[in-house]
């Protein structure tokens, strides 16, 4: 699934020259313009399908909605706070980041902050520059034997843990996603948050800024902490409540804080920055030559690999699209879209609940990536959106009055005469169920409402299909249908029938293009519909 029409990319922030070179070597046109106003950014994007930014460019809803050609936004770094994800997703624009690019640099800065807090190195340096010699004022504390609480145990959190363990620190932590067994493998004991607060001598945060993490350290949690706790935030401004932190510093509950990020950057309120026990930097977490080179290289490689259909990594807002690049999953994504398109043509404008059912071991976890593809098939002809795709499908489906559920059946190979893996799409409470599978790399239709096709019907993007159901006992039906095709001037490209089910047979005809009307057909058959996905 290559983004074949992605041809031109705007780089709107300063990036390593390797980024431009990799993009150009991959066949993409590149424009580099920095310090653009919103209006200038919108103007530049009118001719670009791709945009690569760092943190300076703000990709707002206004920018996204005005950029008619934009398909992909790449963030050369981890956080995507400067990209309106909801607006991008709604418009079907893919958002990517480079989650590994600045991890080491951010981890090293965090470790440096911890050491500076322990020994007050920046304050002592400032004192020396003032011509003073204040040995007693800057009494520090050893890290050996102290407890470090790490909130967020992803790439950066675990790098911090392994480094600070070398200083003899005990590392405990919390992460709602990483299992205790995994964190134990890199030396971090996971505990509930309420047990972490009173144990820590130092606390460092490494979570994204979410509603659940905003103000994670606040007046209440500071009150539960050990008196004299030291806090580090090199993640995102807002995770630590800045007002609560200032109050904790003023009361002595917090002995020191090291901040690389702020709720507002640069901060207009200088109370924290100016506090004598606060060490601060102007958001330098990724500001190393190595990180900048790595992030620029990684985002460029991700763009080129995506365009060439090789792989898709670093996706922030479309798990299904990532799966669509897997050699195993790609044909199943195509099958899911085909069955969704079939279901819409068959059931009209379905309302209620669409059931997406997978069967077979290799599809055990595929429902969440196949259901968006089913939605694309259901909505692409009916949505008022210019483009329904795997990025925005789940966001748009509820607006269409549909609920989509997924379920899985671990059926044994050969059960019911089917292959090991199947995908079924059904309309709950209505007589509409289509079943398909993948043969080699070809999606095929296996059955409709229990009527099985032998052999299965290939589902190809270049072959419109006409489907109709008839009474099996009518010998005049085939010549009648051929006559209707002849009257319409349409050639028959393929023809298959199902096994008899409840005295009726399904017929599938491959035709060069969809017929203008099926009224003449419906006079001779039980039901008829056509589709092309």
From Swiss-Prot:
Where does the record place the modification N-acetylalanine? Answer: 2
Describe which pathway this protein belongs to, using the record's wording: Amino-acid biosynthesis; L-serine biosynthesis; L-serine from 3-phospho-D-glycerate: step 1/3
Q: Which residues carry this modification: Phosphothreonine?
A: 78
- Establish whether keyword ATP-binding is in the entry: no
Q: Which reaction does it catalyse?
A: (2R)-3-phosphoglycerate + NAD(+) = 3-phosphooxypyruvate + NADH + H(+); (R)-2-hydroxyglutarate + NAD(+) = 2-oxoglutarate + NADH + H(+); (S)-malate + NAD(+) = oxaloacetate + NADH + H(+)
Q: Which residues bind NAD(+)?
A: 78, 155-156, 175, 207, 234-236, 260, 283-286
Q: Which cysteines are joined by disulfide bonds?
A: none
Q: What does this protein do?
A: Catalyzes the reversible oxidation of 3-phospho-D-glycerate to 3-phosphonooxypyruvate, the first step of the phosphorylated L-serine biosynthesis pathway. Also catalyzes the reversible oxidation of 2-hydroxyglutarate to 2-oxoglutarate and the reversible oxidation of (S)-malate to oxaloacetate.
UniProt name for this protein: D-3-phosphoglycerate dehydrogenase
The species this protein was found in: Pan troglodytes
This protein's encoding gene: PHGDH
């Amino acid at each position: 699934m290559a983004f074949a029409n992605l041809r031109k990319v705007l780089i709107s922030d300063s990036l390593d020259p390797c980024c431009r070179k990799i993009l150009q070597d991959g066949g993409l046109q590149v424009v580099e313009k920095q310090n653009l106003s919103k209006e200038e950014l919108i103007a530049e994007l009118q001719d670009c399908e791709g945009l690569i930014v760092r943190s300076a460019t703000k990709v707002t809803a206004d920018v996204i909605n005005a950029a008619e050609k934009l398909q992909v936004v790449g963030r050369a770094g981890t956080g995507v706070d400067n990209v309106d994800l909801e607006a991008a997703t709604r418009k079907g624009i893919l958002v990517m980041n480079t989650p590994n690019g600045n991890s080491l640099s951010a981890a090293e800065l965090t470790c440096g902050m911890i050491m500076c807090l322990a020994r007050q190195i920046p304050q002592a340096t400032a004192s020396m520059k003032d011509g003073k010699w204040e040995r007693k004022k800057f009494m520090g504390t050893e890290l050996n034997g102290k407890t470090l609480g790490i909130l967020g145990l992803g790439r950066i959190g675990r790098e911090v843990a392994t480094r600070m363990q070398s200083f003899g620190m005990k590392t405990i932590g919390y992460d709602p996603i990483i299992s205790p067994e995994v964190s134990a493998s890199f030396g971090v004991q996971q505990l509930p948050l309420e047990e972490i607060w009173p144990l820590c001598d130092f606390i460092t945060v490494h979570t994204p800024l979410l509603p659940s993490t905003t103000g994670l350290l606040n007046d209440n949690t500071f009150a539960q902490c050990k008196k004299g706790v030291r806090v580090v935030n090199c993640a995102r401004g807002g995770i630590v409540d800045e007002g609560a932190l200032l109050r904790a510093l003023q009361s002595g509950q917090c002995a020191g804080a090291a901040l690389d990020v702020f709720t507002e950057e640069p901060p207009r309120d200088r109370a924290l920055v100016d506090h004598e026990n606060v060490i601060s930097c102007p958001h330098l977490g990724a500001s190393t030559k190595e990180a900048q080179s790595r992030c620029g290289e990684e985002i460029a490689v991700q763009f080129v690999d995506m365009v060439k259909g090789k792989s898709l990594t670093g996706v922030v807002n479309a798990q299904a699209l990532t799966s669509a690049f897997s050699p195993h999953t790609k044909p199943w994504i195509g099958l899911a879209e085909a069955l969704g398109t079939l279901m819409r043509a068959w059931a009209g404008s379905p309302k209620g609940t669409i059931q997406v059912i997978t069967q077979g071991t290799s599809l055990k976890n595929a429902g969440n990536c196949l259901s968006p593809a089913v939605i694309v098939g259901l909505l692409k002809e009916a949505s008022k959106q210019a483009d329904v795709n795997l990025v925005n499908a789940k966001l748009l489906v509820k607006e269409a009055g549909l609920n989509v559920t997924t379920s899985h059946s671990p059926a044994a190979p050969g059960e019911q005469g089917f292959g090991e893996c199947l995908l079924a799409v059904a309309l709950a409470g209505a007589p509409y169920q289509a079943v398909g599978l993948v043969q080699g790399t070809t999606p095929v239709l296996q059955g409709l409402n229990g009527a099985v096709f032998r052999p299965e019907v290939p589902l190809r993007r270049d072959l419109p299909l006409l489907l109709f159901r008839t009474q099996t006992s009518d010998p005049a039906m085939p010549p009648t249908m051929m006559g209707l095709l002849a009257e319409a001037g349409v050639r028959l490209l393929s023809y298959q029938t199902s096994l008899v089910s409840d005295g009726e047979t399904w017929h599938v005809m491959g035709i060069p293009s969809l017929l203008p009307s099926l009224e003449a057909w419906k006079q001779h058959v039980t039901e008829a519909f056509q589709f092309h996905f």
